[in-house]
Amino acid sequence: MEKWIAAPVAVILLLTALVSAACAETITFQDKLGRRVNIHLPVRRAVFFETYELTAALGVWDRVVGISRYAYANDLLLAVKPDIVRTIPSVGSGFDVNIEALLRLRPELVVTWAFNPETIRFMEEKGLKVVALYPESIAELYEVMRLQGRLFGKEKKVESCIDRMNKIFFLIGERCRKVPPQKRKKVIWLGGKQTSVSGAKGVNNDLIGLAGGINPAAVLKERSLDVSMERVVAWNPDVIFIWGGAKYNVSDLLASSQWRHVTAIGKKQVYKAPQWGTWSPRLAVVALWMAMK
């Protein structure tokens, strides 16, 4: 009797294994550092140092085993997953990885940014599979979003997000196209330092263009760069946006004698952005916020 029971059980187990193998897939992704990374799908254990806001849109919390400590202060993540601090361990950040904590989590994939290649090499030496991202345009952001859709089998959700983002961008574009080129404002985006400006590369430059502005710092073919105060004064921007994570505020620029000759200061057209991610679907909301200024 036991033999008759064991036989069908063995067949079921064999069929399950065959189905699992058939569903398994490997994709090759060339990341921002030019590395070709082979990734086995579906990813079941992932650590996010970056692009963690996208997990909220995709609803893949059961696949996230570790996260950047900065995620603990993210308003979106705290709203959709109030228990994030208790349920998802921090593994440091892309700047300072806690390698012991990371290895304990046994991730199948680590998603980080390309800013720190040495840290990426260090993680790889420890046997971890790492993808380095740094979207430098809206088009590249869409590529990153589609990659994560593939990783977790959420392609339809990603396309839905992209469709909604495009609708917002189209709405902004329709309004801004009515402004003649000669009347478009010069707009700069400041980073962590008061003289750190966003150049031609990066989503910030795309945001300025979408909002109907002209980025004079786009002559710099960089993501961001420290420039002299004299150069900022020469650009004489009409509007200034400050990165939401900067340690200084609008009042600091308005009170500075160095900035007093800049048009944006005189007209009080200086705004500090909300701390919303620009490597996520919330980029569209940031663009809308900028266009309304």
Feature map (PLM): residue ranges:
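A ligand-binding cleft/hinge motif common to bilobed small-molecule-binding domains
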Residues: 116-125, 242-256
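A short, structured surface patch at a secondary-structure boundary
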Residues: 47-105, 109-115, 216
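Extracytoplasmic substrate-binding proteins
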Residues: 26-27, 36-38, 118-196, 217-219, ...
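Structural recognition of the beta-strand scaffold that forms the well-ordered cores
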Residues: 45-48, 65-68, 109-113, 130-134, ...
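Short helix-initiation/N-cap motifs at beta->coil->alpha
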Residues: 32-34, 88-100, 136, 220-229
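Secretory targeting signatures
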Residues: 1-24
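Alpha-helical, coiled-coil/dimerization segments enriched in small aliphatic residues
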Residues: 197-224
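Proline-aspartate-enriched helix->loop->beta-strand connector
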Residues: 98-112, 228-245
